[in-house]
């Protein structure tokens, strides 16, 4: 109904009484379909999708929250201290103007409304209580439920507005399952006019939309099972082709995707006729089910034929959606849109806890579970919980008997195919991710992102104990282990303990290579070659011309030594000088022999931050490396565990060398031929003119040959 008011100037003012209801009904329909929703509210692991604009207009609580948030696109909030069912009813009131709840829940609903500052509901319920105390009894529906309609009009029969999501029906056959509870319904007209007039409609009844939960679906893949497409909803597609907000996971019931407004569907012949009769209660009836959408190739059943058409592309291999940048094809439009974000760098989904931006809503939901510690994915076979869907898929192979993807080169197994593809690059040498600044390439995109932080000087990860900053989170974790002093990783061969797992893995390779060397008696290797394999150095060779070399002797008082040669330098030989007890003998050391074709420049010796005062640059040959240099710099790290192992290795090899030869070796320089073995120790002199010069207990020695 529209009111027309003439104006003196000849203009007309037309007011529609149904426009606000139509807009609300349209927004409610969009919310059910997940269309254009830009916020997800999580209450007790239940996800409610909604529109920020309507929430802010209806609640001062949300209005202030969004004002502080700013424009960050898609967002997810976890609301603590609320009940999911109560919040679902309150959210339905915001979208429809109706409160549909049992009388015993009204107190909790009002408390939630007052907390969220939804004052329209508080005022409407107060007015309803005042009106309910009048002697005129309210009309009852088929289950004895009083129905109260609040309107701003006097004595006008309530007319159905176009687009309203629910309608009134006459009494039908059958008894409602809701008869056990008294139900109260309120309708509020959200105009600015007075809302104190009430009209009781005697013939109107309503059906609670929260129908009883039906039988859970069978796991997908079996004949007769029901599967909904797992793809995320596309906001640009036709809303009519969308499904409801809830869907079954292929392997489990995902609790976080559950919704109070979930409507189950039923296949013909799936349940007995009694369940059908129960749903034929007062209120509107469900429309007749559409013909069964079954795949002829794998016998899977889908809710809509639209999903079946998308699924059949898996069998036909059809990929109609092509990327304009790289030409990659996709079976779904949504998959193409997500892929395009890789080229554009768009990350529309932002975590409200740590502000991390992600490309898809699915990845944001999994990321949020890391903050909450909740494991939202459940195995329907054994009931085990997982925080990520890929973990559930990997676990499900235990029940299906399918093996994990395995690398053909090293037989290592992975959780999914994507991880295997990344791993295969380590064997093939493929490095598709290239730095635009220096041209260095990487096998993984995450490695490139970490590398770019080095150019920018970004170190977002800091140690809470010493304050040292890192550009990589994994480097920070490895550093924090040093503060604990714990060495939880022990070698099963020699019982040597390590603080980090990667050091243990590198150490285990030593034993495997030693066993291989002992088994192959025909193949002999020098001590220097074996030590080089221990440290996994690149096979640098000495120059034939025999240019300058430098030798560094470092005692075991230093935990980690980083030797950083310039691109013109190369590490040729790494060996351990003999010592009876490295733990007690300060003369125990590691010898690094390096060569360079030109003059020694930019040679830097560095250590951990707390040991910086014990390490000095070699001032006689240049103390700083050119910071503008963009060529790659090779870094060799010698940990304390490596020093201990090298000493143990040297004890084994030195036992076969006569003691008389030791003095003879100190009098002659080492061979500088390419690939020469370290059979003689070079004569060393201290850098400082004073004999036996040390820096903070760390002996630095150099020799020029």
Swiss-Prot record:
A Pfam family hit: zf-C2H2
Intracellular or extracellular location(s): Nucleus
Domain BTB: 37-103
Gene Ontology biological process terms, A to Z: hematopoietic progenitor cell differentiation; negative regulation of transcription by RNA polymerase II; regulation of cytokine production; regulation of DNA-templated transcription; regulation of immune system process
DNA-binding region of this protein: 159-171
Annotated stretches, region: Disordered: 151-178, 203-286, 646-691
Name the record gives this protein: Zinc finger and BTB domain-containing protein 24
Biological source species: Rattus norvegicus
Gene: Zbtb24
